[in-house]
Amino acid sequence: MHAIAENHGVKASYTKEELQACGQGRLFGEGAAKLPVDQMLMVDRVSQISAEGGAYGHGIVRAQLDINPDLWFFKCHFVGDPVMPGCLGLDAMWQLVGFFLAWKGHKGLGRALGVGEVKFTGQVLPSAKSVEYVLDIKRVIARKLIMALADGTVYVDGKAIYTAKDLRVGLFDPAAMSGAEIK
């Protein structure tokens, strides 16, 4: 069930089209974790992914989201005071930790398992040009449970605005996901 794909880690960057393909199960093969698609995919491209480097020497992911005033969340959060919901930036970091596991070749259904600490010190407004996510992989556990831990930072136009410590994402056997409870 948690077999490693033979073609894992063959690329160091990914386009929006490739990320959408990941969400449809066409990028890393059958059984690989999927990204959300369409509006819930909070990433336009992965500019760097590596199993080496980063603050802990276990890997790094850099990805970007292009910002424009027409993005869906600016229309409803909040009327007259548009701002990207902070939870979407947090979700983007979880998406990228799961993507890292799939890129490494691990299989299973991806689920966010939590975060140790999150700090918001800024915001993403419609006038911004770009958001960058930087994830430093702390550890990958590959036993019965496949799990990655990472620290992440969200930048808007080059300025750090969110930090997250101990982001956790796990990959699960589909049979263990039959109800509301994760087994």
Curated annotation (Swiss-Prot):
GO terms for cellular component: cytoplasm. It holds the Pfam family FabA. Keywords: Cytoplasm, Fatty acid biosynthesis, Fatty acid metabolism, Isomerase, Lipid biosynthesis, Lipid metabolism, Lyase. The active site is at H77. GO terms for molecular function: (3R)-hydroxyacyl-[acyl-carrier-protein] dehydratase activity; trans-2-decenoyl-acyl-carrier-protein isomerase activity. It catalyses: a (3R)-hydroxyacyl-[ACP] = a (2E)-enoyl-[ACP] + H2O; (3R)-hydroxydecanoyl-[ACP] = (2E)-decenoyl-[ACP] + H2O; (2E)-decenoyl-[ACP] = (3Z)-decenoyl-[ACP]. It is found in: Cytoplasm. InterPro entries: FabA, FabA_FabZ, HotDog_dom_sf. One of its GO terms (biological process) is unsaturated fatty acid biosynthetic process. Homodimer. NCBIfam families: fabA (TIGR01749), PRK05174.1 (NF003509). Belongs to the thioester dehydratase family. FabA subfamily. Necessary for the introduction of cis unsaturation into fatty acids. Catalyzes the dehydration of (3R)-3-hydroxydecanoyl-ACP to E-(2)-decenoyl-ACP and then its isomerization to Z-(3)-decenoyl-ACP. Can catalyze the dehydratase reaction for beta-hydroxyacyl-ACPs with saturated chain lengths up to 16:0, being most active on intermediate chain length. This is 3-hydroxydecanoyl-[acyl-carrier-protein] dehydratase.
